[in-house]
Amino acid sequence: MKVFIILGALNAMMAVGTGAFGAHGLEDKLSDKYMSIWEKATTYQMYHGLGLLVIGLISGTTSINVNWAGWLLFFGIVFFSGSLYFLALTQVRILGAITPIGGVLFIIGWLVLVIATLKFAG
């Protein structure tokens, strides 16, 4: 699906931008603890953005379950990386419970991708 190529490219682009912003704009403003959180958010956004690109490239050749995997990864980025960016910038922990939800969405998304691929290949 073209939407996952677009979402993947946008997330990869944003991960590069937020990584550069963190390295050059936030390094003197955030403690090491919160810089580490910021870096984790950018890293996971990049990995899963690349995953979205792959899903976009293969989605026309496999089952509809691949689309589910794409949406799970996308919302995983929103919840996981989004809550970590918020935490790093504000030090407000109120969204801390959302971060693991994003992680679970990542795990389920990758699992759905494996299952969809096995069904298609089988």
Curated annotation (Swiss-Prot):
Query: How does this protein sit in the membrane?
Result: Multi-pass membrane protein
- Segments traversing the membrane: 3-23, 46-66, 69-89, 98-118
**Keyword Cell cycle annotated:** no
Keywords of this entry: Cell membrane, Membrane, Transmembrane, Transmembrane helix
Q: In its keyword annotation, does this UniProt entry include Membrane?
A: yes
Q: Where in the cell is it found?
A: Cell membrane
Q: What is its main location?
A: membrane
Example of a GO cellular component annotation carried by this entry: plasma membrane
Family classification: Belongs to the UPF0382 family.
Tell me the protein's name: UPF0382 membrane protein SE_0353
What species was this sequence derived from? Staphylococcus epidermidis (strain ATCC 12228 / FDA PCI 1200)
